[in-house]
């Protein structure tokens, strides 16, 4: 189990990402616009740098919904490989069963 503080930190990051997503996207469009003046582009870079570091989507880490485990995360289920296996063995995931060949 991950510490509660780590789970809370990831939740805080998720909120920041959604809060600043539009603003970050607009600034990135302005920065990559070759028709904009150099001064406008540079000001956009400075504004982007002034945003909170955790508002970047690349700072987020996918974590298991049950345990908070950061490694072995399966996006399709939102769980770590360990919890997916446990749920599979109990028959809690429809259509998923242990491989046999």
From Swiss-Prot:
Transmembrane residue ranges: none
- What keywords were assigned to this record? Ribonucleoprotein, Ribosomal protein, RNA-binding, rRNA-binding
Subunit relationships: Part of the 30S ribosomal subunit. Contacts proteins S3 and S10.
Task: Enumerate the GO terms in the molecular function aspect.
Answer: rRNA binding; structural constituent of ribosome
Signal peptide segment: none
Gene it is expressed from: rpsN
- Tell me which stretches of the chain form a coiled coil: none
- Record-level GO BP terms: translation
Q: Which family does it belong to?
A: Belongs to the universal ribosomal protein uS14 family.
Which InterPro entries does the record match to this protein?
Ribosomal_uS14 (IPR001209), Ribosomal_uS14_bac/plastid (IPR023036), Ribosomal_uS14_CS (IPR018271)
Report the function annotation for this chain: Binds 16S rRNA, required for the assembly of 30S particles and may also be responsible for determining the conformation of the 16S rRNA at the A site.
Q: Which GO terms describe its cellular component?
A: cytoplasm; small ribosomal subunit
What's the name of the protein? Answer: Small ribosomal subunit protein uS14
């Amino acid at each position: 189990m991950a510490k509660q503080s780590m789970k809370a930190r990831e939740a805080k990051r998720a909120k920041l990402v959604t809060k600043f997503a539009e603003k970050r996207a607009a600034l990135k469009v302005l920065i990559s616009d070759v028709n904009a003046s150099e001064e406008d582009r540079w000001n956009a870079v400075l504004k982007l740098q002034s945003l909170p570091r955790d508002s970047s989507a690349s700072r987020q880490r996918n974590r298991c919904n049950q345990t908070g485990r950061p490694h072995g995360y399966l996006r399709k289920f939102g769980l770590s490989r360990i919890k997916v296996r446990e749920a599979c063995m109990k028959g809690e995931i429809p259509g998923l069963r242990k491989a046999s060949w």
